[in-house]
Amino acid sequence: MKNVRYQLFKRSLAFSFEAKTSRGAIQTHDAYLIKASTPKGIIGWGEASPLKGLSIDATPQFENQLKEIISNLNQGIDARELDLSKLPSVRFSLETVHLDVANGGQMRLFNSTFLQGTPQYMNGLVWMNTPQHMLEEAILKAQAGYDCIKFKIGAHEHDEECRMLEQFRKKFNANKVQIRLDANGAFLPDEALPKLKDLHAFTIHSIEQPIAPKQMEAMQEICAKSPINIALDEELIGLNPNTDAGNLLAKTGAHFLILKPTLLGGLAAAEDWIKQTQKYNRQWWATSALESNIGLNAIAQWTATQNNPLPQGLGTGALYSNNFETPLLAEKGYLYYIATKNWTLPEEKEELIVHLS
């Protein structure tokens, strides 16, 4: 974009609880916010927040790379001329900041009924904790109106996790609450099928990434023999949807793809994956990847334009104790955009790391 000036902000987001995954505990997550300003006073925001241990751009050099990119943009270099092939979160942030500016800079990136009050169907996420705590959290979410609940599993003894799901099913049958599982690649290939057969007893909709990615033959066998539908998540990271998706979908036979724009290179890249799911008769849903409310806002507004009836994985600002206030509101299994609520955005005196020159 011509005559646009860019600034870079950083906020260390602090989890409001002990966030655990099968890859370990997370206490903070760095959010990098790009602010674009035009001579007419239009301001847009985008977010680049790669996930450590997962995103291909979550490296020690990332902040310096991002500073250099902002410097290049302020020197008049077009974003399309920059090599961002290994920086998917930056592609997402620049795509969304430019969408924001192009649409008037009101944090309204797409024109949809979502912005006019039509809510989006979403799943409730149960973070990894002790099995008892997870059970209690799932019950609370079901009582709060969520009829699709996703459990992160794989960190505890298999029998313990089965008993947790059994206890949940005693209170909420499959007609009342759909269960999704996410193993984050925690199962070993030779143990995955027996575990999936055990988990099938609890009427499971799907399980994300039962084994670690890049094990094509093992994943192919699991997809073919599993009694539970398989969803691919981490498997997509670093792949090109236009050249790699056909081989992935045809070989594995996976039923669902999980699309995370921060990890895949933005909304346009996610739409390329959607085209592949249509070609191979698969389904998908989108999931946020621990972004702040700025990144979540962009993803939620985009998913609202896709007319996907499946529950989306749109985690909300309640994850963090120092997130940005937002018009987004999660209630009774739906995500709402409350147009009368205002944003709070980064403060220059505290969080600005690249100034206008």
Across the structure, where does each feature detected by a protein language model lie?
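A short pocket-lining beta-strand/turn micro-motif at the edge of beta-sheets
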Residues: I70, I77-R80, H255, Y280-A286, ...
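Short glycine- and Lys/Arg-enriched binding-loop motifs that mark or flank ligand-binding interfaces
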Residues: I42, Q120, K150, P261, ...
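Catalytic core of soluble alpha/beta enzymes
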Residues: H156-N297, Q301, Y320-E331
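Active-site pocket-lining/capping segments in soluble small-molecule metabolic enzymes
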Residues: F110-S112, P213, T287-I353
